[in-house]
């Protein structure tokens, strides 16, 4: 699995924003990679994980919500903290609304952040639900 904790602005649009941690995040700060690769031998040994990740690949996955549950699922680790409904390698993955964790550790819905019109246009262009 490859992911990141945040996206980054690198002069991507006419606003010329740079880096991250703006008071109001941009699309580029919110767009976070989440890649899963499985070797042929892993796919053969754990076909249920491959089938689930293939079935979930077009879903609007939130990497921050899914990373930990997916790692526990892939590792076969049993714990009361494991939530397979948020594991993209589980057959019953459930989409949750996207949120942004602000500087006060409070989850906020994306449409309540004061983002600019062009940020919502980019989310829609990439088919990212919010």
Describe the role of every protein-language-model region.
Residues 1-130:
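Catalytic domains that recognize anionic headgroups
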């Amino acid at each position: 699995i490859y992911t990141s904790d945040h996206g980054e602005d690198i002069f991507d649009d006419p606003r010329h924003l740079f880096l991250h941690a703006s008071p109001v995040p941009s699309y580029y700060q919110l767009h976070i990679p989440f890649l899963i690769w499985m070797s042929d031998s892993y796919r053969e040994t754990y076909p249920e994980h491959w089938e689930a990740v293939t079935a979930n690949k077009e879903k609007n996955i939130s990497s921050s919500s899914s990373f930990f549950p997916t790692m526990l699922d892939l590792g076969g680790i049993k714990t009361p903290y494991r939530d397979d409904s948020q594991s993209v390698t589980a057959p019953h993955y459930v989409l949750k609304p996207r949120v942004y964790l602000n500087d006060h550790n409070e989850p906020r819905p994306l449409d309540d952040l004061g983002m600019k019109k062009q940020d919502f246009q980019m989310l829609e262009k990439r088919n990212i639900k919010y």
